[in-house]
Curated annotation (Swiss-Prot):
KH type-2 domain location: 206-283
Region G2: start-end pairs: 41-45
Protein's UniProt name: GTPase Era
Organism whose genome encodes this protein: Escherichia fergusonii (strain ATCC 35469 / DSM 13698 / CCUG 18766 / IAM 14443 / JCM 21226 / LMG 7866 / NBRC 102419 / NCTC 12128 / CDC 0568-73)
Binding-site residues, GTP: 15-22, 62-66, 124-127
Length: 301
């Protein structure tokens, strides 16, 4: 008699900004769908990553980092997106960084204590901990904070113990029909993924120079007769000086960003891509909830 049981559930990946949530998601999926950079607050939307293996389907929600600073409209909305992800999942992966513990970590923990879902604590970047003797006392301190389902020291970057996290997730998926076909890796549209790729390259090549007041709008995304895609991306900044920074000397910076973004798009979409980028000043958008709604920042709240 064949066993036709299937298992499926939602898992939220939460934590303060820049602890490695997106890197962990990409590692769990075996490919990149969530943008990563060393700059905090890179993830702005909840990304759904789907991993299907045989009878098991894990649907991961990669939340923006929760943080205490809520002054700007964009930060308020990002915190709301992250908090709402915690409420409707079967399991939570709480990511913290090595032996660091901050008020933002404490704030996330307090939200999790109020929740019903079991929590796996993923202690990331353990390979970067200089004093290994500090690790065990810190893990004991963390264990005393909450009744975690499990505590797993990991390195999302190298993949250390990520398979352990995946095994714990699989073991706790409820019996349910799969929500997505087995070949799906995300429920986000190609248009959305294109904007995320461009935004990652902006973060990568402009780094600390560029404030968070930059976003990307895909104005055109069409199939062409060559079997590929024609994509027009609009980069929105808040000030004229930022526009010059993005364009670079004689257009060198935006050219590099475009070349690297196109490479990633072609790999993701498995088709040729013709990409054109423009930069436009739209002052105050990060403070304007209406502007944020028009850019899709509240479609998932």
């Amino acid at each position: 008699m064949s066993n036709d049981k299937s298992y499926c559930g939602f898992i939220a990946i939460v934590g303060r900004p820049n602890v490695g949530k997106s890197t962990l998601l990409n590692k769990l999926l075996g490919q990149k769908i969530s943008i990563t950079s060393r700059k905090a607050q890179t993830t702005r939307h909840r990304i759904v990553g789907i991993h299907t293996e045989g009878a098991y389907q894990a649907i991961y929600v990669d939340t923006p980092g929760l943080h205490m600073e809520e002054k700007r409209a964009i930060n308020r909305l990002m915190n709301k997106a992250a908090s709402s992800s915690i409420g409707d999942v079967e399991l939570v992966i709480f990511v913290v960084e090595g032996t660091r513990w901050t008020p933002d970590d404490e704030m996330v923990l307090n939200k999790l204590r109020d929740g019903k879902a079991p929590v796996i604590l993923a202690v990331n970047k353990v390979d970067n901990v200089q004093e290994k003797a500090d690790l065990l006392p810190h893990l004991q301190f963390l264990a005393s904070q909450m009744n975690f389902l499990d505590i797993v020291p990991i390195s999302a970057e190298t993949g250390l113990n990520v398979d352990t996290i995946a095994a714990i997730v699989r073991k706790h998926l409820p019996e349910a029909t799969h929500h997505f076909p087995e070949d799906y890796i995300t429920d986000r549209s190609q248009r959305f993924m294109a904007s995320e790729i461009i935004r990652e390259k902006l973060m990568r090549f402009l780094g600390a120079e560029l404030p968070y007041s930059v976003t990307v709008e895909i104005e055109r995304f069409v199939s062409n007769e060559r079997g590929g895609y024609d994509i027009n991306g609009l980069i929105l900044v808040e000030r004229e000086g930022q526009k010059k920074m993005v364009i670079g000397n004689k257009g060198a910076k935006i050219k590099t960003i475009g070349i690297e973004a196109r490479k990633d798009m072609q790999e993701m979409f498995e088709a040729p891509v013709h990409l054109e980028l423009w930069v436009k000043v739209k002052s105050g958008w990060a403070d304007d909830e209406r502007a944020l709604r028009s850019l899709g920042y509240v479609d998932d709240l």
